[in-house]
């Protein structure tokens, strides 16, 4: 692109000298008017001294002109002679306006280096060859698969960054070839391991044997995301945030994403819709059919819905703790999962809250964890 050259800007003293000539004044005359000696005035006329706000007011009175005129002369001259702006300022500002760059640096996903390398790092992170192909900053499409567009319209920039980190980690994993039949058969075993929090670490291993990669990545601030099903290199992977750090939420999100895998949702698009559990309660959000199907599968997996409905009808409005424990034993699931399902139905989220304790730490033995002061090396 051809560089434009701006016209030179004379120092303000040049105009003052011209004004003196137009009025047939001598420099000593102006010095007298301003109440200063000629040696004090000389640096101003030769551009060696600046027009201060006080001097701009005085010159305005001397020449019967607005003080702003002289102040603007000085401002234009200063701007013209300012040091060239670091081109990295615009580069960093453009990326920061679109993506949580500082958080990405903090998490170790990109390096804090000179701006000239920022474009390259971001293209490499998103797997693009041109900045223009990256959504939110260029014209790249977030939705390569039209059938899923309604859900992708809710995808935010922090969510988009997060799911790419999930994919980058998943690409480093080696698992068995994906087996739909194997995954379906493993559901009962996965559910059995939900009864004891100490057994949760076994679930990622079961998924790996079925050819499904499991990745745990802490959500970025404001991302509002619970999980996603991605297909890097055509092999399924499940990414989760454990945003709510509760067993009922973990079980629900896990089974929800497994259903996406079993159905092949997003396989042609690299990733299925990012999932925010609870978004289905928003009447203004249109959810695709595959999301409703995954919701039903997740709910049935957690607690058989007919049995749950019968239990709630029989015991309402006063469901005792002992009733819940007995029912959870009967359906062979941890009480926290039953309580979570009833809380969702009744909207009473403080009910038996003591059972909703954290589960995230039970998964930290899994190698493929990023966040919570842990960094998974994916290369830059």
Task: Indicate residue ranges for each PLM-predicted region.
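Active-site hotspot residues in diverse enzymes, especially metal/ion-binding acidic/histidine motifs
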Residues: 2-380
């Amino acid at each position: 692109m051809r560089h434009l050259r701006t016209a030179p800007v004379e120092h303000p003293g040049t105009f003052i000298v011209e004004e003196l000539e137009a009025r047939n004044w001598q420099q000593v005359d102006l010095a007298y008017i301003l109440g200063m000696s000629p040696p004090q005035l000389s640096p101003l006329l030769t551009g060696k001294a600046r027009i201060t706000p006080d001097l701009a007011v005085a010159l305005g009175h001397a020449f019967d002109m607005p003080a702003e005129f002289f102040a603007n002369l000085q401002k234009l001259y200063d701007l013209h002679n300012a040091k060239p702006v670091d081109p990295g300022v615009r580069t960093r500002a453009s990326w920061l306006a679109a993506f949580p760059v500082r958080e990405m640096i903090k998490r170790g996903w990109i390096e804090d280096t000179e701006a000239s390398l920022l474009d390259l790092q971001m293209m490499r992170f998103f797997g693009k060859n041109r900045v223009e192909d990256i959504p939110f900053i260029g014209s790249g499409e977030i939705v390569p698969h039209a059938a899923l567009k309604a859900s992708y319209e809710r995808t935010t920039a922090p969510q988009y960054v997060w799911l790419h980190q999930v994919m980058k980690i998943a690409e480093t994993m080696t698992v068995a070839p994906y087996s739909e039949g194997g995954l379906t058969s493993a559901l009962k075993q996965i559910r059995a391991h939900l009864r004891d929090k100490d057994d949760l670490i076994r679930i990622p291993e079961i998924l790996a044997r079925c050819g499904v990669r499991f990745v745990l990545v802490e959500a970025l601030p404001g991302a509002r995301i619970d999980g996603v099903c991605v297909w890097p290199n055509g092999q399924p992977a499940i990414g989760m945030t454990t945003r709510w750090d509760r067993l009922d939420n973990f079980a629900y999100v896990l089974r929800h994403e497994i259903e996406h895998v079993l159905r092949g949702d997003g396989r042609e698009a690299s990733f299925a819709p990012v999932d925010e559990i609870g978004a289905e309660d928003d009447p203004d959000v249109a959810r695709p059919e595959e999301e409703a199907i995954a919701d039903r599968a997740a709910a049935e997996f957690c607690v058989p819905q007919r049995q749950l409905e019968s239990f709630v009808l029989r015991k309402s409005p006063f469901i005792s703790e002992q009733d819940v424990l007995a029912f959870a034993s009967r359906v062979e699931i941890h009480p926290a999962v039953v309580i979570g399902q009833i809380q969702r139905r009744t909207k009473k989220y403080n009910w038996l809250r003591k059972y909703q304790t954290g589960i995230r730490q039970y998964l930290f033995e899994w190698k493929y964890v990023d966040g919570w002061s842990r960094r998974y090396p994916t290369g830059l």
